């Protein structure tokens, strides 16, 4: 998943990717970042995401939970810090309480983490008005 998340982050112009926990540390040996986006984009493990949110960014939880706003109706803030839940669970309540908003992708069931990242970042780009970074073909 991390390799696919890094590829999506690179494709859609994210500035960095942060993660918590130890799953990635155990999976790092499998080298799933086939486009080596980690060389262009910081991938940083942190203890608590609340401590690393860049100044001016709005924390947005992405989780399939009661009360979340559907993505098709959502207007992304100019500077967002998206926090995604794990595939085999949900975000802790302290995280969703901390976030300004919680959004979800309307589906029948839950999505793979990397697929959800792609959908959210594509939606952000598609609803935006600056495609200049996305016109180059590589």
Question: Could you describe each region identified by the protein language model?
Answer:
Residues 28-32, 72-74, 115-116:
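Short secondary-structure transition/capping segments
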Residues 1, 9, 83, 116:
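Conserved RecA-like P-loop NTPase ATPase core
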Residues 2-63, 125-130, 134-137:
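RNA substrate-binding interface of SAM-dependent RNA methyltransferases
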Residues 10-11, 98-135:
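Structured adenosyl-cofactor binding patch, chiefly the S-adenosyl-L-methionine
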Residues 49-56, 74, 96, 105:
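Alpha-helix C-terminal capping segments
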Residues 22-24, 86-89, 106-111:
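Short, acidic/turn-prone active-site loops that include or flank metal/cofactor-
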Residues 48-53, 67-69, 110-112:
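A short acidic, often aromatic-flanked loop/helix-cap motif at beta-alpha or helix-coil junctions
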Residues 65-103:
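Active-site/ligand-binding-proximal alpha/beta "capping" segment
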